[in-house]
Design a protein with these regions (language model features):
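Acidic/His- and Gly-rich active-site-bordering loop/insert found
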Residues: 22-126, 135, 145-154, 333
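An extended, acidic, His-containing surface patch that forms the Zn2+-binding/catalytic region
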Residues: 89-90, 196-198, 255-320, 327-328, ...
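Hydrophobic h-region of N-terminal signal peptides that target proteins for export
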Residues: 11-21
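Sec-dependent signal peptide recognition
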Residues: 2-10
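A short core secondary-structure module
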Residues: 173-175, 229-253
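Acidic/histidine-rich catalytic neighborhood of metal-dependent amide-processing enzymes
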Residues: 122-123, 129-206
Length: 487
């Protein structure tokens, strides 16, 4: 493998070898190896074997003489924390965080979900993009940093957490209540953003500065349960389908949050004349013009998430027998609310859709925790490092704080006062976002690009140095051949 040249003149100026001697071939190979090995450990819901994934990670820590702590909220669940000490204890630590669990594997996979497959430049398997790629990237970078002679200015923490979104009661929520004194970070990088490629003629570096609020609502329809050979008109499934049709037709009003204002203002110069006019109405028009402009913008699926609440039916329940109808049928609606929404008012609005229907009931199964944390506004030093690194990697891109369509751990960190941004791999084309889909994958190029971006930010923020050269050196096939580790 060819190594990057070490520049003697830079050495003479006293710049740390960290600034230019990065061995991208080794780093890329390690990230790929870790991702493959982590995919091969089943950490899928509802009973994720996170302890086995944690065991794999702390074995890597042991090999590299890294101290670690493990926090186990209950059997099978685990949170693993490691630290690289900085030279200035007055600087608040930087936390690199990823979650160990994955969604369950649904139907339709052509590749084995629990065994990584490398094919056509892609790595297939459950968690490839949500979020074992983050764990693999952080682990490769963290172990490499520990073996360098120079220390960072501030502590760097790596937390492989248990659960996220509605599963955070074993992860960050639990840690914040029971073990936050072990973490006490001031800044954090997590999942949630990415690089949107050429959608509007240029690259957009999307730094997740806010999430949406997570809410589950259960709709239940009540009918008459009978033998299936003697059907009746008030079949609960038919009644539920009619209720779902109402939900499908419901169009939540648009809200223009401060984060959305920043995002649309940043992308306005990239639009054609019609697009610029629409965004101008959205940001500066009368309330009526704003709503009209929002409806036009919401035709784009991603823009819709920035302006409106979204509702997705997920779990259906009815009769368990093929020869009988149930007296009840229900569906769980997973709802992502804009951060300035009153959850109770939104729930009341949904209830009002069925106020004249006695056979339909709504229950808020999971309510968002309020008050919701204030979004990041991009005025802090961590965002400055994100922007500095993005300008080097993507010279013609714009870097903008924006809102993630999903929810996650970032809201819990922000509630603790931690300045938190979400960053990830390329997001384009958006149709190739395979998280929670059959044959989930990440391309090797995107994995290496994610590593390069995160490494550049860490160097800029924690070391106060450029990471040069920023261009990656691709590992050979032999270097990226995975070592499968048994747990």
């Amino acid at each position: 493998m060819e190594r990057f040249a070490r520049i003697l003149s830079v050495l003479l100026l006293g710049v740390s070898p960290l600034a230019y001697a990065s061995d991208w071939g080794t780093l890329n190979a390690d990230a790929k190896k870790h991702l493959i090995n982590l995919i091969n450990i089943d950490t899928s819901l509802p009973e994720p074997d996170e302890i086995s994934a944690a065991r794999y990670i702390y074995k890597q820590f042991n090999k590299n003489r890294i101290d670690w702590d493990i926090f186990i909220p209950r059997k099978g669940r685990a949170n693993l924390l490691a630290r690289i000490k900085g030279t200035n204890p007055e600087l608040k630590p930087l936390l690199l965080i990823s979650h160990l669990d994955t969604a369950s594997a649904g139907e339709g996979w052509t590749f084995p979900p629990y065994k990584a497959t490398v094919a056509d430049g892609r790595i297939y398997g459950l968690g490839a993009t949500d979020a074992k790629n983050y764990t693999a990237v952080y682990l490769a970078l963290f172990t490499w940093l520990k073996n360098q002679k120079s220390a960072p200015k501030r502590d760097i923490l790596f937390l492989a957490s248990s659960g996220e979104e509605s599963g955070s009661e074993t992860g960050l929520v639990w840690l914040s209540e029971s073990h936050w004194n072990k973490i006490n970070a001031g800044f954090a990088l997590n999942e949630g953003g990415g690089i949107i490629r050429k959608t509007l003629g240029t690259d957009i570096v999307f730094a997740e500065a806010s999430t949406k609020m997570y809410m589950d609502v259960k709709i239940t329809a009540y009918g008459t349960g009978v033998h299936s050979s003697m059907p009746v008109n008030d079949n609960a499934v038919y009644l539920l389908s009619q209720a779902l049709a109402k939900i499908a037709q419901y169009n939540p009003p648009a809200q223009i949050t401060p984060t959305a204002q920043t995002f649309f203002k940043a992308i306005m110069p990239l639009q054609d004349e019609d697009g610029q006019t629409t965004i101008k109405f959205l940001l500066e028009g009368t309330p009526q013009n704003q709503q009209s402009a929002a409806e036009i913008m919401a035709l784009d699926p991603f823009f819709r998430t920035q302006l409106k609440a979204t509702i997705s039916p997920t779990v259906l329940s009815a009769s368990k027998d093929s020869n009988s109808t149930s007296g009840e049928a229900s569906v769980l609606l997973n709802i992502r609310l804009l951060p300035n929404t009153d959850p109770d008012a939104f729930f009341t609005e949904l209830q009002n859709l069925f106020k004249d229907e006695e056979n339909i009931s709504l229950e808020m199964v999971e309510r968002p925790q309020t008050p919701f944390p204030t979004p990041m506004d991009g005025s802090d030093e961590l965002f400055a490092s994100i922007k500095n690194t993005a300008q080097k990697l993507f010279p013609h891109a714009i870097t903008v704080p924006a809102m993630s369509p999903a929810s996650g751990d970032n809201e819990f960190l922000r509630k603790l006062g931690v300045i938190t941004y979400g960053l990830g791999p390329d997001m384009n084309p958006l149709e190739e976002n395979t998280a929670h889909k059959p044959d989930e994958f990440i391309s090797e190029q995107d994995l290496y690009g994610q590593l390069r971006f995160i490494a550049g930010i860490v160097f800029d923020f924690a070391y106060g140095q450029d990471l040069l050269p920023l261009q990656t050196e691709q590992p050979s096939a032999e270097e990226t051949k995975p070592t499968i580790e048994q747990n």
